[in-house]
């Protein structure tokens, strides 16, 4: 691991210094040597892209994305050995810290889920349906001016938006209900580890589904009606 590599690095640098070499030169020489050695396994592409996930998998690296599962690595035998050998933490201390990590993760997702439910039902859906009503009124006005067939042709875009808004708001409503139920189920789990896993696999996943629908509505509803900050506006908030 990284810790072992750092320990080995210090050991080699100390050996060079003991042999009479200047400290700075010893560090630079060892670094130069290590850079040459690791060149074949370095990845110079975008580490946030799917390309890296594929490449990392080929190299046998862990590509796990679930935080609660990743926390488990602290309790791997090699991890415990590293922490204990360096006098940082004992196995018991690592176990205690992991309990806190799992509990903290759960509480953060829990709070975010509650806020998302509130924003969805009390802000996003009312805003979207208000804009939908404006579109309906526009379509009705067009029908009062033109023959029905021509009016519907001229209002084709608005009719599509009216339908899309209805479908997306219904999906959000169902999603929020499912989100609440997922939280209720997860909250009954006593183990902090298992509860965190449940929050990641069910609650956080449902939040992503709801967010997708809200993001789509954000692109549909006109700016003056959308009271929440849009993504592009967040760039200019001080």
Regions found by a protein language model. Give the residues of each.
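C-terminal amphipathic alpha-helical interaction region
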Residues: 33-238
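An acidic, glycine-/histidine-flanked metal-binding catalytic module
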Residues: 1-24
């Amino acid at each position: 691991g990284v810790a072992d590599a750092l320990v080995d690095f210090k050991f080699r640098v100390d050996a060079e210094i003991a042999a009479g070499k200047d400290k700075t030169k010893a560090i630079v020489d060892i670094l130069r040597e290590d850079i040459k050695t690791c060149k074949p396994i370095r990845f110079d592409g975008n580490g946030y892209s799917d390309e890296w996930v594929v490449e990392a998998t080929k190299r046998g690296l862990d590509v796990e994305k679930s935080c609660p599962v990743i926390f488990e690595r602290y309790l791997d035998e090699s991890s415990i050995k590293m922490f204990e050998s360096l006098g940082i933490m004992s196995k018991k201390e690592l176990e205690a810290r992991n309990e806190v990590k799992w509990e903290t993760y759960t509480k953060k997702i829990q709070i975010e889920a509650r806020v998302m439910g509130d924003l969805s039902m009390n802000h996003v859906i009312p805003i979207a349906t208000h804009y939908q009503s404006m579109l309906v009124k526009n379509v009705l006005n067009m029908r009062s001016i033109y023959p029905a067939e021509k009016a519907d042709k001229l209002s084709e875009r608005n009719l599509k938006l009216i339908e899309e808004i209805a479908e997306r708001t219904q999906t959000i409503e169902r999603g929020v209900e499912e989100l609440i139920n997922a939280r209720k189920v997860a909250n009954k789990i006593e183990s902090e580890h298992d509860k965190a896993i449940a929050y990641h696999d069910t609650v956080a996943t449902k939040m992503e589904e709801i967010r997708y629908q809200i993001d789509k509505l954000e692109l549909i509803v006109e700016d003056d009606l959308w009271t929440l900050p849009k993504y592009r506006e967040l760039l200019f908030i001080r």
